[in-house]
């Protein structure tokens, strides 16, 4: 292959898109796009009681926090707080037709052995995952003290009482010995920052707030309300890849507006074979999770237990592309080998498009020209076929994006496309780019009145991404200064295991307060900065998108990076820390 020619093509695709696009957050005049369409609001009286633990966020991270604390500490009163109408997090909000996990269900859905659940498919539907998360909440008694349809407005530390004061938009003011925040990655929807956004007179909504009252149907399809409708979708990421076949089946006309094409590989979904679980030994899920984690981090294993496109593709590329801490061999030769392997994989995906899409011009427009991990890979067995339907039009904007909206439609490439319904598949506020407290919607006031928004004004400061000096009995679950991996649920499982261990130590040793020491925090921050710039060159050569801050990776604070030594090493750091038993880097009082 002519590697320089490949690089030049990728550069052209990057450069014609410029540096990113602007977004409009779903707040203020656009807050309707973030309202809950699924659960009718219920009124209640404010609470002024006390709990052992307040957990902000009732998604996978919040549920695992509650479950681990129940298992490890025996703490009785654990209160989940969420603005949604139930547990589930992203699986509560995302109910769009076709929604599924893109990581194998057997390694993604947490606590399968503990709950006694076996997923019905290799890649479960959103409703199946949501129901499983509800079962977790029931099993561990997490509904009992939960507050739904409730937004935290402030967390404030009371030093004399060694308690957190939790204020909410319902007038609650209650106390908690510990607080844990797990606000998630897909917490707040964002819209494209388009001229005319406020003037569009048709029906519109964000995919994470799906309006089934308008479209009809449910998460499995059956969108009968779209039979006579012209529908537009802005965005071609993983949501649209799953959604498009259902829209195409029911809409009179479907326009898919594309800035950058997705890289779509085979999904290969299948039902769980009868009796599959009968031969599984105790501990099977953790072993399977760790096997997947290692393979997708470039660490060879004796066996590939998952055997999907994540493991088959990522295992070939990850050693050279991802920061695993393995520095063996000539770095330049490793990089070249990785680049060649990357090109071969992307050529495979581009060839698949030619084999499926019948119109040559449409096929050409759907081809992604960037490296594998510039964007999260997509997997689907029906998306590309959608573009063979006569009622579907791909509006490729040549990397420029939609120009503007009018009262009746969407303008792209100088042409107006009239639509009755406009669906925004434009993602969420990004945790690396949007300040934590802004994305959370509240500030955290620690010892001496210091606000987290002030302490983190130039970027995060933590120990292991979990605890912050000056904020006692407080835990934050995120990817910032912590491990990052394609299986987010696994990483949350490891973080919450660590959190519960720390709380257990505090309780067993008779202390009231635990926090990161100043020295412990400083040492971890130095390690984050030392490793933070490792993937900047890679990201700078990607087309603009979520991972590279819309083409400006250098514009993100390095302090907000994930741990640069790889997620496997991050998990090992936490395990070695627990095994040492000396609680290094913490202060207990």
Swiss-Prot record:
Which Pfam families does this UniProt record tie to the protein?
Answer: NAD_binding_8
Is-annotated flag, keyword Membrane?
no
**According to its UniProt record, which cofactors does this protein need?**
FAD
Going by the record, the broad EC class of this enzyme is oxidoreductase
Q: Which organism is it from?
A: Streptomyces arenae
Purpose of the protein: Catalyzes the flavin-dependent Baeyer-Villiger oxidation of 1-deoxy-11-oxopentalenic acid to pentalenolactone D in the biosynthesis of pentalenolactone antibiotic.
Q: How is the cofactor bound?
A: Binds 1 FAD per subunit.
Q: Which residues bind FAD?
A: 60-61, 82-83, 90-91, 102-103, 108, 152, 491
The coding gene here is pntE
Q: What is this protein called?
A: Pentalenolactone D synthase
